[in-house]
Amino acid sequence: MKKIVRRILIVIPAAALQVLWLLLLVKWLAPYTALITLTMSVAAFFFVLYIIIKREERTYKILWLLVILTFPLPGALFYLFFGNKRTAKPLGKRLEKVKEAGTPKPLCIGAVPFDGGHRMEQTLRWLERKTGYPLMRAGQVRYYALGDDMMPDMLEDIKRARSFVYLEYFIIEPGRLWDSMAAVLEDKAAQGLDIRVMYDDLGSISTFNMDNVRQLRSKGIKCVPFNPLIAVKGTVNYRDHRKMLIVDGETAYSGGVNLADRYANIEQPYGHWKDTGFRVTGEPAQSFTHMFLTFWNAFSLQNNLPQPELKEPRLPAPEIENGYILSYYDSPLNREASSNQLYIDLLSQSTDYAWFFTPYLMPGDELLDAMACAAHRGVDVRIIMPGIPDKKLIFRMSRSFYQALLTEGVKIYEYTPGFVHAKSFVSDDVVGTIGTVNLDYRSLFLHFENNSLFYRSNIIAELKDDFLSTQAKCRQVQPYDIKHYAVRWIVDGILRIFAPLC
């Protein structure tokens, strides 16, 4: 809260000065109104052309075209600061500068027995090439159907750490969970281990302030915020939504769980909190180590610290033991959103079923079309959503997409005990994903995310069983639940236009 108050005290005087300056400017420029109007119209015309030519999702384009055509000058300025990905170029330069060092080398995908045919091989080759991260043997993988089960194991692995512990989370919030974890981290730092914590400045704006950071640093823990929130630099977008814990480069945790009490159902402000996650050991942890170090070196002033050695993964054995995993991070700086395209591709390959967990449902048109096409082919497409929302407006926006999906044969379920925060996908008993990617525009196109694709791993059966178990506690949304009133139809249309901003 102190962090928010401090920033408000800075922003309000600055905004007041800007308003005063604009009033004086308007008075001075009054005689030139006609010329200014013409100039603004010409500028708006070129902005519209620029947006039309840009390679972006069409829903996003339509939103900004409406804003700029309705309010030419403020709309154009708003787009430059909040809608234009060029503001993220400094982030991209910092990341590219450090990414080349220590990248895990890709495996020989040709050695993987693709019983599903050539198409899955193409998908994995594309994902390797697109993200720069390798397909690896999954080895020992543990699935977590709740954060309640995941947190104790995380603490135990931290206690067993011998060399380093790295944490990167969107939200860190002091409470029973974080306080117990921080105590263990402080003890490990006192033993001389390399402890690093990275958190997103916007995601933790109301929960984790500089006092918390100074407390960690005073105990020997290195702690940095990702992309500090500075409105004039357009950093509201391009947040670090990734979630990972790496211990000694040998064990890694990821999934939807942040470091706050509600994620382990210690507190239940939105009913029962349903999440998913996993633990991997051995070679797959190397990808997470590299993902963390890439961001740490790009955004920490301490990037001259010695880095742990990344081991080159061995080629997979010809026979499948526990399948394969490909862990990667997605970036808003990419021309093609990796996770969005991956889900479109996997939906096109599905023959039996394709099931999603997601807390928010505001996908782009291409992903909506892919879901509809799969349902038309007879694929059982299901989506589990929250029954109790954490953000009512976002939930209302998500529901505005229900009708379009239900009429195409997609089944939607709402989790009546509480809130679903899981971000997972499973299809045909063959492939699944677990990560941080929500099915909304911000997550698919504007945030840094991490995701893990599992192929023919035992975790897929566990994910499927968990989906069915969760579905049994859900209410299925029926077409008659979505009233076709004219007012609702208009409201839904407006909400869908503005969905990319939420």
Where are the regions a protein language model picked out?
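Helical hairpin unit composed of two closely spaced alpha helices linked by a short loop
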Residues: Y360-R382, P386, K391
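Thr-Gly-centered strand-to-loop micro-motif
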Residues: F357-T358, M385, Y415, I434-G435
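NAD(P)-dependent dehydrogenases' Rossmann-like dinucleotide-binding region
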Residues: T351, F356-L361
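Histidine/acidic-residue-rich catalytic or RNA/ligand-binding cores of hydrolases
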Residues: E366-L368, F395-M397, V426-S427
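N-terminal localization/anchoring segments of enzymes in phospholipid and broader phosphate metabolism
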Residues: M1-N340, D345, Q349, P389, ...
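Short, solvent-exposed amphipathic alpha-helical segments in soluble enzyme
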Residues: T294, A370-A374, S400
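Catalytic-core elements of nucleic-acid end-processing and repair enzymes
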Residues: K423
